[in-house]
Amino acid sequence: HGEQTYPETMSDIIIPGIGSLEPAPALDHLDLLAPPVTVALTALAERGVATASSALVVAIDPELADTEVMTREFDMDLTLSSNCILVAGKRAGEERIAACVVRATTNADVNHVVKKRLDVRKASFWPQERAVEASGMEYGGITPVGVPGSWRLLIDSACSVGWSCIGSGLRRSKLFVTGEVLAALPGAEIVEGLGV
């Protein structure tokens, strides 16, 4: 069981475009993460994904959780934010679900890329109630970290490099992870052109 290595100080980690937010190590603040997110992040760290230890979390007012509002309020760069969109389609009566991660400056190409990946005729956004119930996360806080293993996890190649501000599973906080962490999530598929 290896020693966890954390940055000496948070000033060692520079996140371009973070604005006035001051996050802290996520593994030291598990109360700010939804249970499935805690499990997934801890598992990554135990697996030796070094960058999992660099994941950061910051508490925010739930009223400011929406990307556009948060970006304005904290003077953040919109390109730092990545959204997790849940999409579903059916094939031979079987529902197929994908969690799609794209930069906030783009939209998930549901009608072409996602549909093809899921191998379904028609793909559409998952209803809010189902998304919340199945993920164990709060609406507005749904994140790729800790989604059910039966779902496809599609990550736009633009999110596989640099930092992303993503949900924590809760509306009252945000998670900051590197592209390496997203790529190391179980079942993660890096997809060119997912975000358009």
PLM region spans:
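Extended, low-hydrophobicity, polar/charged segments
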Residues: 6, 10-196
